[in-house]
Amino acid sequence: MELWFTEYQTPTLGITCKTKKTLHSEKTEYQELAVIETEQFGRMLLLDGIIQTTVADEFVYHEMIAHVPLFTHKNPKKALVVGGGDGGSIREIVKHPSIEKAVLCEIDRRVIEVSKEYLPEISCALDNEKVEVVVGDGIKYVKEHKNEFDVIIIDSTDPIGPAEGLFAIDFYRAVYDCLKEDGIFVAQTESPFIDKELITRIIRDVKSLFPITRLYTCAIPTYPTGYWCFTMGSKKYDPLETDIDSIPDIDTKYYCPQIHRAAFILPKFAKELIK
Amino acid sequence: MELWFTEYQTPTLGITCKTKKTLHSEKTEYQELAVIETEQFGRMLLLDGIIQTTVADEFVYHEMIAHVPLFTHKNPKKALVVGGGDGGSIREIVKHPSIEKAVLCEIDRRVIEVSKEYLPEISCALDNEKVEVVVGDGIKYVKEHKNEFDVIIIDSTDPIGPAEGLFAIDFYRAVYDCLKEDGIFVAQTESPFIDKELITRIIRDVKSLFPITRLYTCAIPTYPTGYWCFTMGSKKYDPLETDIDSIPDIDTKYYCPQIHRAAFILPKFAKELIK
């Protein structure tokens, strides 16, 4: 018998992976949560049947969502991750020597607990002494903290269901207020190939709030189309002006100083989205 | 009833697309050839059940395989495409004003004929007056022509079955001899995420023959992992030294002068492949 897991990434497109076994499956207060072991990508975290991260390619997403804003900022001391209960973004954040505190605010306690059990290589820094884990609503947390963080990372699920509010202009406004006067936020904002309307709208919203708005991309095999983007809003520092020669060599598999620059260079069709 | 076409991109990974109808299907002298109409990517050309090109995302592959070498060369007049019977690479080549002649050498006459019938937006330049279409073995053609082309594009299927010889060092040696003294060739060389051994071997082979060897990448949703690479061997011109400010604006959707530079900037794990 062969088992294949299929995610329908759009109503007319799917990715299908041969599966060794289901390691965990439950219905949490918020969503269906599962960890399966696939042949191609190893262990894979699923929320409502959608691939969140896999041990084979998680490095791309987590390195790119964390190091690009952290190295754009001159001296980040305090960072917040909204969502990201698997801990991958936190793991990358604590690699930065200047970081004194990293807060994770994840709404679903079970995502954290299951990641700790089944994805130790991703969640490994959640017990780091610099890390505070808050189980709660990220929108509420952001609204209750003002002028506090150097970097905020919106490490959310897709903009349907529980994460919808994390893609709204009201939330970006709260993020602005939650950042210090030279703060930077980054949000994962889906695929430039198939989420054009969403990205165009987000860019417009962020531009209306932040003096510097940028879009950057990377290659993630298990996400729809394999091509993914992040939107950055920055109060002071421009990632295009980062002195990449000053970026220290850190332990990464995708991110490097040259990629810090190249990730912002968009193909023509994607440049149209940020006009 | 719903019809879904699934390509198994590896033994443990597949892409699946909802399909409106099969427009064409036949067994040619060389392979199974089909054109299907999918909801997500429109018309799609399949050879032996493997996606070759789709009307939705073909622009990435064809622009990147053609314009990068053509704009690296200072004054390309004569270009050869080995394979590429759909005509997409030829369509891009004839956009260059300096091109006087473009030869297509495709082994399977039916690929050309079926592309002309079902993929007119891709094959549209095959009847251009600058284009010569040769139905024949690309290896034989290259071996019989010496010191003749400015740019050679190896627009092949995967390195199994009929195209295997197009990934061999003997063929690259013949390509070297077929190029003029300042010639450049580019070959499609699969995915940096899952074809690491192949790419490492090709880079080593090309380095042993050409003074300048480069790897560049782009994002192609319908190819395995969505992240694709091309290997360039050049006798004189280095694409990293192209004066990108001198590149004229041409009608493209992915390629642009900035991408000409950025495509060669590789994430850390891919840089390992070319060491």
Curated annotation (Swiss-Prot), chains A, B:
Pfam families attached to this UniProt entry: Spermine_synt_N (PF17284), Spermine_synth (PF01564)
Residues forming the catalytic site: 155
InterPro entries in UniProt: PABS, PABS_CS, SAM-dependent_MTases_sf, Spermi_synthase, Spermidine_synt_N, Spermidine_synt_N_sf
Superkingdom to which the source organism belongs: Bacteria
Main location: cytoplasm
Alphabetical list of CDD domains matching this protein: AdoMet_MTases
Entries under NCBIfam families matching the protein: MFS_SpdSyn, PRK00811.1, speE
Species this chain originates from: Acetivibrio thermocellus (strain ATCC 27405 / DSM 1237 / JCM 9322 / NBRC 103400 / NCIMB 10682 / NRRL B-4536 / VPI 7372) (Clostridium thermocellum)
Recorded catalytic activity of this chain's protein: S-adenosyl 3-(methylsulfanyl)propylamine + putrescine = S-methyl-5'-thioadenosine + spermidine + H(+)
Subunit structure as annotated in this protein's UniProt entry: Homodimer or homotetramer.
Any Gene Ontology CC annotation: cytosol
Residues given in the record as spermidine binding sites: 62, 86, 155-158
Stated family: Belongs to the spermidine/spermine synthase family.
Lineage, opening ranks: Bacteria, Bacillati, Bacillota, Clostridia, Eubacteriales
Record-annotated PABS domain positions: 2-235
Leading EC class: transferase
Gene Ontology MF, one: spermidine synthase activity
Name of the protein in question: Polyamine aminopropyltransferase
The protein's annotated pathway: Amine and polyamine biosynthesis; spermidine biosynthesis; spermidine from putrescine: step 1/1
EC number: 2.5.1.16
Function recorded in the entry: Catalyzes the irreversible transfer of a propylamine group from the amino donor S-adenosylmethioninamine (decarboxy-AdoMet) to putrescine (1,4-diaminobutane) to yield spermidine.
Any GO BP: spermidine biosynthetic process
Keywords attached to this entry: Cytoplasm, Polyamine biosynthesis, Spermidine biosynthesis, Transferase
Localisation: Cytoplasm
Binding site for S-methyl-5'-thioadenosine: 31, 106, 137-138, 162
